[in-house]
Design a protein with these regions (language model features):
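N-terminal beta-alpha supersecondary unit
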Residues: 1-76
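Surface "functional belts" at beta-alpha junctions
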Residues: 21-44, 99-213, 238, 243, ...
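Stable alpha-helical structural segments in soluble proteins, enriched in small hydrophobic residues
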Residues: 56-60, 95, 113-116, 215-225
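Phosphate-handling active-site elements
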Residues: 61-65, 93-103, 119-123, 229
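DPxDG-like acidic metal-binding loop motif
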Residues: 71-102
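Glycine-rich phosphate-binding/hydrolytic loop that grips phosphoryl groups
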Residues: 209-238
Length: 254
């Protein structure tokens, strides 16, 4: 199965991967990266995506077979960059007649962080706080733990708030949402890199390397969820209005 993966939630990443399974979608499915293109600029998604997509799809070993699906990051992220990636994914899916699946950007960061934490600490069931840059001196934040080797479970709703209020936002959860989220083992995400005060939110005071998710991790999560029969919608998680909005219509003076 050949999959195109696009993430424009922070910088921009485009990758084409192959799974080792051609029939069905197992919960754990090894993937091979055939091509990858990325850039770190957080404000040039629309200008970069076309060229990056062309490079990824024309790389050696990619053009010999058609794509079977597209996976795209659904945020949360600032409006313009996230929209560019999702629109591109939907256009590719529509023109090629293949399905498009969505995965939250925070989920991808959490999966990478849990991989790193498990390799370093050997914890069986750590809880990770993911905080990514939401601009306006705010972060998108939520708690996660592993759900098998390739997926994650979100323990809280996604909050958008100032870094100093993250602990409070996480604490204000229903019992069902907050179950098992009392101890935070580590922090990951671009918000943790920007706002060091977030580190104190974690009981072990550890910051993990993943600043953003990546296209390969999105595919791992998507395959795990599709293997369980889940539907992966592509509705974007903006969580607030766009930074740039159309001006209101002028009032007529009579």
């Amino acid at each position: 199965m050949r999959i195109l993966s696009i993430d424009s939630s922070l910088g921009t990443q485009v990758a084409v991967v192959d799974t080792t399974e051609t029939a069905g979608l197992p919960v754990t499915c090894p993937v091979q990266v055939l091509s990858r293109a990325e850039q770190a600029d957080t404000r040039r998604h629309a200008e970069s995506l076309g060229q990056m997509l062309s490079e990824a799809l024309s790389a050696p070993g990619v053009a010999d077979r058609p794509l079977d699906a597209v996976v795209a990051a659904t945020g949360p992220a600032p409006f313009t960059g996230l929209r560019a990636g999702l629109v591109t994914a939907r256009v590719v899916g529509r023109t090629r007649g293949i399905p498009v699946h969505g995965v939250s950007s925070l989920d991808a960061v959490a999966r990478l962080a849990l991989d790193e934490f498990g390799a370093r600490q050997g914890e069986k069931d750590p809880v990770v706080l993911v905080a990514t840059d939401a601009r306006r001196r705010e972060v998108y934040a939520a708690l996660f733990r592993a759900n098998g080797p390739d997926d994650v479970t979100r323990l809280t709703e996604i909050s958008v708030c100032p870094p100093a209020q993250v602990a409070e936002c996480i604490a204000v959860q229903t019992p069902e949402q907050g179950s098992g989220a009392g101890t935070i083992d580590a922090v990951a995400g671009s918000g943790a890199a920007l706002y060091p005060e977030l580190v104190g939110t974690a009981s072990c005071h550890e910051v993990l390397a993943p600043v953003s998710g990546d296209a390969l991790t999105q595919v791992r999560i998507a395959l795990a969820r599709l293997g369980r029969g889940e539907e992966l919608g592509t509705q974007p998680l903006y969580l607030r209005h766009a930074d740039v909005q159309m001006p209101a219509a002028r009032k007529r003076v009579r």
